[in-house]
Amino acid sequence: GKMDDPVIFTKDCVSFIQPGDSSIGLKKGNKITLEQALYATLLASANEAAYAVGANVGKNAGHDYNWFVQQMNVRCKELGGNNSHFANTNGLHDPNHYTCARDMALIGRELFKHPEFFKIVQTLNYTIPKSKTVEKHEFYQKHKMLWPGGSYYYKYAVGGKTGFTSDALATLITMAKKGDTKLVCVVMRTHGRNIFPDTRHLFDYAFKNFKKTPVSGNETSKDVGEILADENSGYVMLPKGVKFSDLKMKMEVDKSMPSEAILTEAILSEVQERS
């Protein structure tokens, strides 16, 4: 969808909200833009906004909300995520809605390619202005590692998303960038605000102990030469002190996967073989 596409809130978009569910109070009949709905979803974790995004984008594509959810599952598998199944757009508990840290990290890695995502999540405060179709709504970024001056601020963090349900407990996905190294950290089933220092410690460990090594120019095998012809086609994170030449490659190609995911699996195989 386009950022200025209208998002209309039907009864289905709001009727499921229960006391304690994250919401900014959008109501049936409200009309905002897709951009405003994304800000409400990504900053304030507004469950009704997340539902409305799926319902309206699905409708505009000639389908419905359930079709949009199914596309989420399709896209996850395209990225190499094989241990997830999404049953809704907001993450509220459903026995058929599950994921894992690895799949969330794959999605987080993909988000680095979408600057519009970072424009939204790096916003600290946002207001949906009052209009004929909606009351004024003000909300803020819940990811405390993105707040300069805050006790949990992490200067290398560039984006992310918080999450909580009584079943899943606290979850957090965070993207960080230091120099030319980009990392994604996923922490799940954590209690309270421990999720922020836990994430920071994991990032600090990774930045301190691993280095980004391009595969192109280092891999000399003719079997993968064509795949790695593009110098930007891939890299591997190596423990500092380990040379690329120390690795022993094992190539396994799954033809059902897209080329990007195939390359990722090949690179991971090199590291795992060495370890």
Model-derived regions: residue spans:
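Active-site-adjacent loops and short helices of periplasmic peptidoglycan-processing enzymes
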Residues: 1-102, 111-114
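Domain-terminus/edge residues, biased toward the C-terminal soluble/receptor-binding domains
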Residues: 81-82, 96-98, 102-275
